C-alpha cells in the first residue's frame, strides 16, 4: 500500500489539528485509521503501552513522529494517516521535540512495516524542505500533490 493511495482512499489526513498532549495527537491519527477500518480501537492503547515500555520510540526526526504498534495489536490492513498540529507538542524525546507532524502507520506484518512504510516516509522527507512544505498545506489535495511531486522526483 502506497502512502499517497492510503491517505487518499482512507480520507486519513487531518491538517492543523488541535491537541493539548502528545496522547491526544496520537489519538487523532489512530481515530482516522479506526474510521477507515484499518485498525481496531485497541491499536491506540498498544501505542501508549509501547511508549510506556520503550519511551517515545516513534519520534524519528525533528518535528516528526511515526506512531505505530505491532501487527497483532489490532491491525486489519496496512494503512497510514497524516496529522499536522497547529501547535507543536513535547513527546519527551531529547533530540526531536517538539513534534507537529504525525504519520501513523499500521502494517499487517514486519516486512511491510520496514520496506513499505518506513521507506516511503524516509523518501518523503529526504528533501528536508518537505517538512515546511507539509506544514504549509491547508487541504488534503495539497498534501497529495506534495507526495506526488516527491515521488516524481525520486
Swiss-Prot record:
PROSITE patterns: PTS_EIIA_TYPE_2, PTS_EIIA_TYPE_2_HIS. The modification Phosphohistidine is found at residue 68. Transmembrane segments: none annotated. GO terms for molecular function: kinase activity. It comes from the Bacteria. Induction: Induced by L-ascorbate. Repressed by UlaR. Residues 6-150 form the PTS EIIA type-2 domain. It is found in: Cytoplasm. Keywords: Cytoplasm, Kinase, Phosphoprotein, Phosphotransferase system, Transferase, Transport. One of its GO terms (cellular component) is cytoplasm. NCBIfam families: PRK10372.1 (NF007694). The phosphoenolpyruvate-dependent sugar phosphotransferase system (sugar PTS), a major carbohydrate active transport system, catalyzes the phosphorylation of incoming sugar substrates concomitantly with their translocation across the cell membrane. The enzyme II UlaABC PTS system is involved in ascorbate transport. This is Ascorbate-specific PTS system EIIA component. The gene is ulaC.
